């Protein structure tokens, strides 16, 4: 029987995090969207002023089992600000490898992010999910999250690439 530990990611975890980011993108049918590199993850998450923070779910083998520690999931988050509520935390990604789902690992990651949010004085933990990912939506609702599209009618938008350059006049 393996044990799961949720811990803060270290710079040396960036290769595993990138692998899991790619797996998540594949699962979401958006693998062509991943442009990030391991070097960028290192620079952006472990420099003097990190743009993100990350937790990893690591399987630790039980005594006598041959397999060593193995990263099987992650939660990548950053801090944001609401003009209505103040400090927020945004969970950009949460992913658990398929063979480890249904064991409470995703819940543990989300709960740990919630602990960080409260410790930092955040009033909200926000995240987004694709509309077809019912399993994830059911988990978030079971943990107490509110679906803002249903409840308040919010839609997410983004400016990217050429649209952002054009908007900025560059």
Curated annotation (Swiss-Prot):
**Where is it mainly found?**
cytoplasm
Q: Which GO terms describe its cellular component?
A: cytoplasm
Question: One of this protein's Pfam families, by short name?
Answer: Acetyltransf_1
The N6-acetyllysine modification is found at 29
This enzyme's EC code(s): 2.3.1.-, 2.3.1.57
For this protein, the record's InterPro entries field holds: Acyl_CoA_acyltransferase, Diverse_Substrate_AcTransf, GNAT_dom
Q: Which UniProt keywords apply?
A: Acetylation, Acyltransferase, Cytoplasm, Transferase
> What is the active site of this protein?
140 (proton donor)
**Which sites bind acetyl-CoA?**
94-96, 102-107, 133-135, 140
Please name the GO terms that the record assigns under molecular function.
Answer: N-acetyltransferase activity
Q: What superkingdom does the record give?
A: Eukaryota
Tell me the residue numbers annotated for binding substrate.
27-28, 92, 152
Q: Which reaction does it catalyse?
A: S-(2-aminoethyl)-L-cysteine + acetyl-CoA = S-(2-acetamidoethyl)-L-cysteine + CoA + H(+); an alkane-alpha,omega-diamine + acetyl-CoA = an N-acetylalkane-alpha,omega-diamine + CoA + H(+)
> Per its UniProt entry, what is the enzyme's top EC class, as one word?
transferase
**Keyword Transport among record annotations:** no
**Residue ranges of every copy of the N-acetyltransferase domain listed in the record:** 4-166
| Subunit and partners | Homodimer.
UniProt lists the family membership as follows: Belongs to the acetyltransferase family.
Checking PANTHER family in the record gives: DIAMINE N-ACETYLTRANSFERASE, THIALYSINE N-EPSILON-ACETYLTRANSFERASE
Its biological function? Catalyzes the N-acetylation of the amino acid thialysine (S-(2-aminoethyl)-L-cysteine), a L-lysine analog with the 4-methylene group substituted with a sulfur. May also catalyze acetylation of polyamines, such as norspermidine, spermidine or spermine. However, ability to acetylate polyamines is weak, suggesting that it does not act as a diamine acetyltransferase in vivo.
Q: What is this protein called?
A: Thialysine N-epsilon-acetyltransferase
Species, as recorded: Bos taurus (Bovine)
């Amino acid at each position: 029987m393996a044990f799961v530990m949720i811990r803060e990611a270290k710079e040396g975890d960036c290769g595993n995090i990138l692998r899991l980011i790619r797996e998540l993108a594949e699962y979401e049918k958006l693998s062509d969207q991943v442009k990030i590199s391991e070097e960028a993850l290192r620079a952006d998450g472990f420099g003097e002023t990190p743009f993100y923070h990350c937790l990893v779910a690591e399987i630790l083998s039980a005594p006598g089992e041959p397999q060593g520690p193995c990263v099987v999931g992650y939660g990548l988050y950053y801090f944001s600000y609401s003009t209505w509520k103040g400090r927020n935390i945004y969970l950009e990604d949460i992913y658990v490898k398929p063979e480890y789902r249904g064991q409470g690992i995703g819940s543990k990651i989300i709960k740990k992010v919630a602990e960080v949010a409260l410790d930092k004085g955040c009033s909200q933990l926000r995240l987004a999910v694709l509309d077809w990912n019912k399993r994830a939506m059911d988990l978030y609702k079971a943990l107490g999250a509110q679906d803002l599209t249903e409840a308040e009618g919010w839609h997410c938008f983004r400016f990217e690439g050429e649209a952002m350059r054009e908007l900025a006049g560059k």
